[in-house]
Amino acid sequence: MAKVIGIDLGTTNSCVSVMEGGNPVVITNSEGARTTPSVVSFQDNGERLVGQIAKRQAITNPHKTIMSIKRYMGTDHKETIDGKEYTPQELSAIILQKLKADAEAYLGGTVTQAVITVPAYFNDSQRQATKDAGRIAGLEVLRIINEPTAASLAYGLDKMDTNQKILVYDLGGGTFDVSILELGDGVFEVKSTNGNTKLGGDDFDQRIIDHIAETFKKDSGIDLRTDKMALQRLKEAAEKAKIELSSSTQTNINLPFITADATGPKHIDMNLTRAKFNELTQDLVEGTLTPMKKALQDAEMSIGEIDKVILVGGSTRIPAVQDAVKNFTGKEPSKDVNPDECVAMGAAVQAGVLTGDVKDVLLLDVTPLTLGIETLGGVATPLIERNTTIPTRKSQVFSTAADGQTSVEIHVVQGERQMAADNKTLGRFTLSGIAPAPRGIPQIEVTFDIDANGIVNVSAKDKGTGKEANITITASTNLSDDEVEKAVNDAKKFEEEDKKRKESVEVKNNAEQIFYQTEKTLNELGDKVSAEDKATIEEKLNALKGVKDGEDIEAIKKATEDLTQAFYQISSKIYQDAGAPGAEGFDSNMAGEANAGQNANNDDNVVDADYKVEDDEK
């Protein structure tokens, strides 16, 4: 049976895991790392880079490098690259393709199914967008699971015989979530969740960027934030400084030749202390405390009832964040899970539950936001309150607002505000064919259905006429089926193009290697090769030389094969002559050199510096 992978599709970094031997295992990527930067870069030659290789060249290619696209999931934001528009779903799919390919390389087979995590506070549009991204990447998304819940699965898999109340504090690159769970007898029950989808490590970086930029502007009068290349250098320096300040009390920010004016080049060389960093980001840290209070209130628990505190997300390594959590909870956070990997591992556990590989685990998650409809006066009338266990179904009867009304528009909203206009619109649909009657007489039953992914379906039925209408919520920011299908086909096309490009370069590299080895060996053999044979080889060498730098791959393959076969025949003759009485001994290693080119691509000592492959742009 094919494996189902667990994916943590993060704002700044992503991770993929799979169940092996009853435990989740993190899959290393093609570069040997356990996490992959969520960065996509488009090259001038049409190649797409993903991950660390894309991040490395961001300074020289800032206009075509996309970072933190997760922050725009579920919105109508688009990135335009070389005249083509890309949605957040399509860009996220490129990252997912990379993770999928790394998993396939590790598992040695095709991967078609996955469990993907999202921030607990993601709304319906954001969840739908994540599912669409998976589909575009060629993955059937079996389940969307909340990140803090996934982290608790990774934490609690080997502690199922204990009863614990857990607080999961998840501060990632772009989002913040807190969830309260009860763990006991294999049941992981989410009691409440809260958060902020616009708060994360990127915001901490931005404070450093602004501090550097403002200081530089004060000294030079130049605002570096208007220069994309300089801004990218600031971003890298800010992230590096933030990381260094987690282990030291001061760091140096040195950016020579950051810009220039009429007076000459300008440089940045400044120190940033941890105390200053804490001052710059104090409100961000404090902004995580209110959601914790709300989550505890909704769970009807006091902080004293919490047994364990789990920190998730790379941003929880910031000392001020750890201190804030420690002071709020009065507990030392658990070190049982890796904050960068536990979400993907938990997703793999959930995948194991769905496939039957993991037994005796039951996950009960909740919907993070209240769902309702707009009623008379623009009021948001709730049908399903936040923190309701999912999957769930709830119905309520409404009526018409005017005499003789024959249709009603159902306006579906998500959020905690009293007025519909202040909440997130998930969608609208119309129920027609209502029998004319005085206002308040018709009975219209509205039913909300939330599946295990947290995705909403709504139906309305006129109990008098039996007329019915329903909608699977697809907000205007989501892609239609046709758009998803087109994106899927585009992704496949790019995958094929990249495979061809990769094959082309491998063929060229092989040709170059064989050409070099044959020419070298021919010179070393000297008069051991007859003039006639030498002329034959030189003819084949010239033929390969004439095509090896071109684009006709079949011609390169043929010329390479012709040269290889011709040299094999001469090698055989030399061996025969070497074995004849009185013949000089022949060094077989020389002939072996000719064969080396055939396996050039498998030789760890061969470096093909003219091409970088980021495993089919996954």
Swiss-Prot record:
Annotated segments matching region Disordered: 579-618
Protein keywords = ATP-binding, Chaperone, Nucleotide-binding, Phosphoprotein, Stress response
Any GO molecular function: ATP binding
Induction / repression: By stress conditions e.g. heat shock.
Which domain of life, per UniProt?
A: Bacteria
Phosphothreonine is carried by which residues?
175
Q: InterPro entries, alphabetically?
A: ATPase_NBD, Chaperone_DnaK, Heat_shock_70_CS, HSP70_C_sf, HSP70_peptide-bd_sf, Hsp_70_fam
Point to the regions of Low complexity compositional bias. Answer: 591-604
Q: Does the keyword Phosphoprotein apply?
A: yes
Q: Which NCBIfam families match?
A: PRK00290.1, prok_dnaK
Q: Its biological function?
A: Acts as a chaperone.
The protein here is known as Chaperone protein DnaK
Which species is this record about? Answer: Clostridium tetani (strain Massachusetts / E88)
Gene assigned in the entry: dnaK
